[in-house]
């Protein structure tokens, strides 16, 4: 038996690890995944009954989910249709004759859910988090991070070869010739290599405060003179914006050589491949499995989800908040909700007490940290109501699965653009109630705990207080800690980017977070090396979360370190 003081992780988890099995359709296992699988089993068995017409809820939104699920689960019909439902969608992109034609259709394609490689979106402003503004992001890359593109990276050649083979197999299902496939993928790889020179690395993207680069509209337009940006955004948001936030500044400074007629062949190839890939979840099962081959290679997942799981997860996508609300109604009692709400209050009080006893912060900074704690908004279990747009998600069983998917996506796309220049909706949840997860949003200064994570072993009304504090208490404290991690520390109580620290205190904070970076940097993690800078925000939240949860547990009369 391993002693705690020799190897804490092995002492706690060693026996479990000897018998733990990673499911073939998942890349990892553990406490979170065990609970997620329980919920998955519940949802699969429940929706099986719904598909058979047994116990379908008296709820129009869930009835539309069932109709959509029925189309997704009808693999015989999907097999018989083959790629035909997607042909017009793909052909429209293949038949684009020029960069000018593409540029003139960007807005229409964007609103219709067609590929544009036009990475713009609407999100809260960093400087005034109460209002939604326009952001210019950058494209993704084939490899997991820009660092993989270094010539001496040991996985570069192997992963690119796996990606290419996966796309070759996929495109062959869509009647592309070998010559067309080779030409298409050569061009996509060429363009991807260009993207990799300019887009941010994961480490760069992890430093939120360094991502804020506002551009006046005329200055930004000058970066891409061949794109009719004013026309595009007049269609998307109803007018020309006055500014855009550009986190991917390096990419956009080079974008004039990407969004140009001279580069049309490569852009066109990328658009065609994107169009094909966009259709793959909705066609035959063979195509679905082929489309996921590269991602499974990246994550080390031996096999694809089976048909039953794939149909459920595809169907729940547009309706996930409604399904989460149903789950919460079944599994999360009002008593449990009230108890968890009180635990959040308790944990915030623990943080205030820890701040009061802090010996390296000045009173000025401590007081501002307490102000931030006082206005953190906790959301427990489930949202009070569903977004209005859910009532407009109507499924037509006379249309194909792909046609319905397109119709449903139009509603969410229109909503995302309608948020521009509008007040931020603080009641909007970023994940459904049946997801085993939790989060802190620094721009809204809120913490969210879906009903799914408020289940055993993380939480149970009938567990000891120590077990609950060691489970959900640590999760709650982890999320609160994110308000003061290397990113959260840059945002004030209103969620705006604002330095509320004294210079001396922030320097002391930086010195301490650097120690966390140094502690984790280069450690072995399942055959790879930890990047201390990339993981520091999570490590800080873990350390702070466990410390605060333990302090809270010790205040209870029935405290048990072992149960914690």
Swiss-Prot record:
One of its GO terms (cellular component) is plasma membrane. The active site is at 479, 542 (proton donor). Residues 1-564 form the Peptidase M13 domain. Pfam families: Peptidase_M13, Peptidase_M13_N. Binds 1 zinc ion per subunit. It is an enzyme of class 3 (hydrolase). Its EC number is 3.4.24.-. Its cofactor is Zn(2+). CDD domains: M13. Zn(2+) binds at residues 478, 482, 538. Keywords: Hydrolase, Metal-binding, Metalloprotease, Protease, Zinc. It comes from the Bacteria. SUPFAM superfamilies: Metalloproteases ('zincins'), catalytic domain. One of its GO terms (biological process) is protein processing. GO terms for molecular function: metal ion binding; metalloendopeptidase activity. Belongs to the peptidase M13 family. This is Putative zinc metalloproteinase in scaA 5'region.
